[in-house]
From Swiss-Prot:
UniProt name for this protein: MORC family CW-type zinc finger protein 1
Any GO BP annotation: epigenetic programing of male pronucleus
PROSITE patterns, A to Z: ZF_CW
Positions in coiled-coil regions: 281-342, 885-916
Keywords on record: Coiled coil, Developmental protein, Differentiation, Metal-binding, Nucleus, RNA-mediated gene silencing, Spermatogenesis, Zinc, Zinc-finger
Region (Disordered): 532-551, 679-700
SUPFAM superfamilies: ATPase domain of HSP90 chaperone/DNA topoisomerase II/histidine kinase
Organism: Mus musculus (Mouse)
Described purpose of this protein according to its UniProt entry: Required for spermatogenesis. Essential for de novo DNA methylation and silencing of transposable elements in the male embryonic germ cells. Not required for piRNA biosynthesis.
Entry's Gene Ontology molecular function annotations: zinc ion binding
Tissue expression per record: Expressed at very low level in male germ cells.
Membrane-spanning segments: none
InterPro entries in the cross-refs: HATPase_C_sf, Morc_S5, Znf_CW
Disruption-associated phenotype: Mice show progressive loss of spermatogonia and male infertility. Spermatogenesis is blocked early in meiosis I. Male germ cells show derepression of transposable elements (TEs) and DNA hypomethylation of TEs. Mice display increased depressive-like behavior whereas no behavioral abnormalities regarding locomotor activity or anxiety-like behavior are detectable and BDNF levels in the hippocampus are up-regulated.
Taxonomic placement: Eukaryota, Metazoa, Chordata, Craniata, Vertebrata
Length: 950
């Protein structure tokens, strides 16, 4: 680094102290930074209290005292550096990561602070003062750090002059004017280790009052001029109660214990949802980039060393070979680390989302976002809570604890660095909020009834007689009452029969005070209530959504038609349609038969009286195989006709026309014609058929009929037609018939697609003439709309199976770049997959090919390795069991030998005591001893034997 000795270096200016503190827009967030330091230090107890001192700005000092691990003089010296922290390198999950919380948090509250810490046999004082630097005219930050020995109270210094200067600065600019007063502050740390932080010269409001109010409530620290709607934004006691996801530290504010909340178990009807995603990759991407840079540096270093070794004029030394070997090992290590980080990047992660109802106040609702057990955001509105007039989601609290590696918080721990990922999380939680409301049965209809049960919570004139009622209702609702032990810090569930609510919660509570005998000892494990899992069912689309999807599908299809052939729709004025000759109509039929379609001919649509319109239906012979039964539907849009002049009858083909028609139908329908010619011929023939299909005598005004050709095989018009029919109301308007022309023997006339034809008009009793159809032409049963529903259900199941397959494979394997999706979440949640599957058929084919050729092959290899490891482990355990069995057998034999020797010695003893000698059989010896003990002869014999021996 000597080559950079002459270069300029950045310096920390005094003004940065104030600028750094302004990152805390929320004042309690600055206080929380100091609580985080105590928690990271392993403190069991933390006291936050104020000490009055009228000589100081603000009128009091704010003190933080904990019993954590404390700091040595060297560790205290590291505190003054900005942006460095050993916590980041630790394997433990510390809240602090940036090395900035103490400086930014304390300087946000006041201008000066002094820190006293004890660790092992040393005591250290750290004086961090803006007032001192400003009055001395310093532009840099100067921090005195004197130290003493704990037992002798002697200074730890190699330079007495430096120690004297540090003390003189502290005596002049701190509230403590002598060394004895400094020692008194060390004595406040009641253990062998701990830390005391004192902040003074507090910052003021424009009114001249301090930002923190310690006079209004003697047992709390309030934020001055803060709104009172949300207690956590005004009361520091209420804020610290929910500050940590899993509270493991006793907090005392103004000498009174804070009743911390395990928020997940303090709500009504809690539910837990498992959200699996691979979208949150912010920090993992950074780690992969760092690992890639490390690999590049290691490879570059290896090449440099290798180049030195391979020089022809250089003698190979052992040191050079060792350096080359170390460089190679470093490259392998860096590659291994890179592969691990890449696997971590691809791995899907599961977040536990908790939801419950806050019955105390329905206006206190929103999401609590924790990061590494520390509260970052609270009461974040999501989903229906964002709507001003919506009551759905009122009073519902959502909770999520995000690991540090999944989503990284900002330096002030009040925001998240990746705003896009955070907004995505809020969107997901809004979706789960709606699902939670469904799971517990809350909807817009019964919200009023639901909250009427908790009106007693909002009554301001509640008397004491209702307090017990509140408690009983709270227990009846199933909200568990849990307390934290002051010794082991475990949470215990109290039975409903306990009367702590009526007497008030004690400041000191231990497990031995628990009425539950199963959890009245600190040695017993912590048993928290189980939170039921919520259900995430795929909800069926509503009627409005189905209509919207249908309209979008029709619009997409029409856009395709316009792109393929702009002149696709024609307006036909029926009053100006001339009559066609039979030859023209037969030629039109011949063209349609070549294309494989059947349309009504104008010759069969004969003119009748003005009060009747004759319809003709034709059906192909059942000579086609089932492979060619795909039906294409062509229809004429319904035309509005006056009700008085319209009367419908049904008449089939006349026998004279049937043979000619059947001959035309026998033509080969698979001729290869270009798509444009097919569409043109279809359009012309359809227009001709439409011109001959309508003739209304009594209608003077011209009637406009719009003809559409829907011959695309990508969109199932049969489903769209069946979904559109129920939307037409026959009682409001009279419409002409939809005339579907169907090819193939699997299709038939949709009676429900003829809203103008009454079913009784088609019966023989109605007076209409119905002729039979000769040959194989018959009228099959009408397919029901359930067919389209079954198709939709089948498609839904297929998509569901595809999602399951992708979610199974993709977390471990790469997603192909052909999908144009960065993650599997974007692919499986793509709405185009459901609304327009025809546009991504190629992608689906690629997906299935990749699953079959790549994923399954890799899966089989992994499964084979896993089975081999299982077989190896089973064989190894079998050998171990055999060895263990042999050892047990040897022990058994030794035990039997010892037992036989003992029985023999016992038989000799009984003979000496003249109590008889049992036989050598072990069972007989045991039986003889039992009889001897029952007769009480043994004590008597021993008593008689003792005088004789004496």
């Amino acid at each position: 680094m000597d080559k950079y000795a002459l270069l300029q270096r950045a310096k920390l200016h005094l003004d940065f102290i104030h600028a750094n503190s302004t990152t805390h827009s929320f004042l309690f967030g600055a206080l929380a930074e100091l609580l985080d330091n105590a928690r990271d230090a392993g403190a069991v107890r933390l006291d936050v209290f104020s000490v009055d001192n009228e000589t100081l700005q603000g009128g009091f000092m704010l003190c933080f005292l904990d019993d954590g691990c404390g700091m040595s003089p060297d560790e205290a010296s590291d505190v003054i550096y900005f942006g460095t922290s050993k916590k980041r390198l630790s394997t433990l999950k510390f809240i602090g990561q940036y090395g900035n919380g103490l400086k930014s948090g304390s300087m946000r509250i006041g201008k000066d602070c002094i820190l006293f810490t004890k660790k092992e046999e040393t005591m250290t004082c750290l004086f961090f003062s803006q007032t001192f630097c400003e009055k001395e005219g310093l532009t840099e930050v100067v921090v005195p750090i004197p130290s003493w020995l704990t037992r002798t109270r002697e200074s730890i210094t190699d330079d007495p002059q430096k120690f004297f200067t540090e003390l003189s600065i502290i005596f002049k600019y701190s509230p403590f004017k002598t060394e004895a007063e400094l020692m008194q502050q060390f004595d406040m740390i009641y253990g062998r280790c701990g830390t005391l932080l004192i902040i003074y010269n507090l910052k003021l409001l424009l009114s001249g009052e301090p930002e923190l109010d310690v006079t209004t409530d003697k047992e709390d620290i309030l934020m001055a001029e803060a709104p009172e709607e949300i207690p956590e934004r005004r009361s520091f006691r209420a804020y610290t109660a929910v500050l940590y996801f899993e509270p493991r530290m006793k907090i005392f504010i103004q000498a009174k214990r804070v009743q911390t909340k395990h928020l997940c178990y303090s709500l009504y009807k809690p539910r837990k949802y498992q959200y699996t995603t691979s979208s949150f990759k912010g920090k993992f991407k950074t780690e992969v980039q760092k690992a890639e840079e490390a690999v590049k540096r290691a490879e570059l270093l290896f090449k440099e060393v290798q180049a030195k070794v391979n020089q022809p004029d250089r003698i190979a030394l052992s040191s050079t070979q060792d350096a080359l070997q170390k460089a190679l090992q470093d490259v392998d290590t860096k590659h291994k680390s890179l592969r691990q980080k890449q696997r971590a990047l691809r791995k899907a992660r599961t977040l536990s989302l908790f939801f419950g109802v806050n019955t105390e106040d329905q206006h206190q609702a929103g999401m609590f976002i924790y990061s590494n057990n520390r509260l970052i955001k609270m009461y974040e509105k999501v989903g229906p809570q964002l709507k001003m007039k919506s009551l759905l989601g009122a009073g519902i609290i959502g909770i999520v604890n995000i690991p540090l590696e999944t989503m990284e918080p900002s330096h002030n721990k009040q925001e998240f660095l990746n705003v896009q990922e955070y907004n995505h999380l809020l969107k997901v939680m809004g979706q789960y909020l709606i699902q939670y409301c469904k799971d517990i049965g809350i909807s817009n209809r019964n919200l009023t009834l639901f909250w009427d049960e908790f009106k007693y919570q909002h009554s301001k004139d509640t008397d004491s007689s209702l307090e017990s009622l509140q408690w009983r209702r709270r227990q009846a609702m199933g909200i568990p009452f849990i307390l934290q032990c002051d010794l082991c810090l475990k949470w215990r569930v109290l039975p409903s029969s306990s009367n702590y609510q009526e007497k008030g919660l004690p400041d000191l509570w231990i497990c031995a005070s628990n009425p539950n005998n199963l959890e009245n000892s600190c040695n017993q494990i912590e048993r928290l209530p189980s939170i039921p899992l919520g259900t995430v069912n795929r909800r069926p689309p509503s009627k409005d959504e189905r209509e919207r999807q249908l309209q979008e599908s029709v619009q997409r299809y029409q856009d395709k038609l316009v792109e393929a052939q702009p002149q696709k729709s024609q307006l036909i004025v029926t009053s100006k349609i001339p009559e066609f000759k039979s030859s023209c109509l037969s030629s039109a039929l011949k063209e349609k038969s070549k294309l494989g379609r059947i349309q009504p001919s104008g010759a069969d649509l004969t003119q009748g009286s003005p009060s009747s319109v004759k319809l003709s239906f034709m059906q192909r012979s059942q000579k086609r195989s089932t492979e060619d039964t795909h039906s294409d539907v062509e229809f004429i849009c319904m035309t509005k006709i006056p009700k008085k002049s319209v009367k419908k009858t049904v008449k089939y083909l006349q026998p004279g026309h049937a043979p000619a028609l059947l001959e035309n139908l026998k033509l080969e329908d698979t001729a290869q014609v270009s798509s444009r010619e097919i569409k043109k011929q279809q359009s012309e023939s359809l227009v001709q058929a439409g011109k001959a299909s309508t003739d209304v005598a009594s209608s003077r005004d011209p009637t406009v009929t719009m003809v559409w050709d829907q011959s695309s095989t990508k969109v199932s018009l049969k489903q769209e037609e069946e979904e559109e029919v129920p939307l037409i109301k026959p009682d409001k308007q009279e419409l002409c018939d939809d005339t579907p022309v169907v090819k193939g023997n699997s299709s038939a006339l949709h009676w429900k697609s003829l809203p103008g034809v009454q079913m009784e008009d088609l019966s023989p009793r109605s007076g209409h003439k119905i002729n039979s159809v000769s040959g194989d032409c018959q009228l099959p049963a009408s397919p029901m709309p359930s067919q389209s529903m079954s198709v939709e259900e089948t498609a839904r199941k297929l998509l569901s199976n595809l999602r399951e397959i992708l979610l199974y494979f993709v977390p471990e394997f790469q997603l192909s770049s052909e999908f144009e999706c960065t993650s599997v979440e974007e692919l499986i949640t793509n709405p185009e997959l459901e609304r327009c599957p025809e546009n991504i058929n190629e992608k689906l084919k690629t997906c299935f090919n990749q699953i079959q050729n790549i994923y399954m092959a890799q899966y089989e290899k992994r499964l084979k390795r896993k089975m081999q490891s299982i077989v190896y482990e089973a064989n190894r355990r079998g050998l171990l069991n055999q060895v263990f069995l042999g050892q047990c057998e040897l022990k058994r034999k030794r035990t039997e030998e010892k037992l036989s020797d003992l029985r023999a010695k016992l038989a000799l003893l009984l003979q000496k005591l003249q109590l008889g000698g049992p036989a050598g059989d072990p069972q007989q010896i045991d039986a003889y001893l039992e009889d001897l003990l029952k007769e009480d002869r043994l004590p008597t014999a021993l008593h008689e034997k003792s005088p004789e021996s004496a």
